[in-house]
């Protein structure tokens, strides 16, 4: 009975929160609508490096700082063939409004069903994904995970990682 309970709890954790990803894993595929209602999937970014960052909620002070950091460094990311995608559980409409308000120059994906959040194991809280960033290489392999995100220097930290790789 004890073994059954352990297996049941383990299965429940994976079901609710996703399996932990590790460096070298193939990045989980996704198919989500962006702020304009256009479906995006992992394969759309094949051939370039990809930053996928999860954020709790649009219009929160921390996320504004983080998003604007990516916006301000966008040309540097492009120079290194790096695409950027932000993901939250917000609606397409909320993300569109947020993108326009802050003149963001990259896609925001709406994961209202928490499918991508589960695949990337960021569903720490039901209503908000945990703040986590995944770096993926040109062939779709996970090469780095930022578990601790410094909102003030996050875009610079990512660029430094790629410059030293």
Where in this protein do the model-derived segments appear?
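Sec-dependent N-terminal signal peptides
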Residues: 6-16
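Structural microenvironment flanking redox-active thiols in thiol-disulfide oxidoreductases
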Residues: 64-102, 113-118
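Short active-site neighborhood of thiol/selenol oxidoreductases, capturing the structured segment around
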Residues: 42-65, 70
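Structural micro-motif
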Residues: 105-106, 124-134
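Thiol-/selenol-based redox modules, centered on thioredoxin-like
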Residues: 129-165
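Short loop/turn microsegments at loop-to-beta-strand junctions
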Residues: 27-28, 49, 130-132
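N-terminal "domain-start" segment that seeds a small globular fold
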Residues: 17-43
């Amino acid at each position: 009975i004890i073994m059954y309970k352990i297996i049941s709890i383990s299965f429940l954790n994976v079901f609710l929160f996703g399996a932990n990803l590790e460096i070298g894993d193939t990045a989980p595929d996704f198919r989500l609508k962006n702020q304009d209602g256009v479906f995006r999937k992992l394969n759309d970014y094949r051939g370039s490096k990809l930053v996928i960052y999860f954020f709790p909620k649009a219009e929160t002070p921390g996320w504004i700082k983080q998003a604007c950091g990516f916006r301000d460094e966008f040309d540097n990311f492009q120079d290194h063939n790096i695409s950027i995608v932000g993901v939250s559980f917000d609606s397409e409409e909320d993300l569109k409004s947020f993108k326009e308000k802050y003149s963001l120059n990259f896609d925001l994906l709406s994961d209202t069903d928490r499918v991508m959040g589960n695949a990337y194991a960021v569903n720490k809280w039901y209503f908000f994904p945990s703040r986590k960033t995944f770096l993926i290489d040109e062939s779709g392999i996970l090469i780095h995970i930022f578990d601790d995100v410094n909102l003030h220097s996050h875009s610079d930290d990512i660029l430094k990682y790629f410059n030293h790789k």
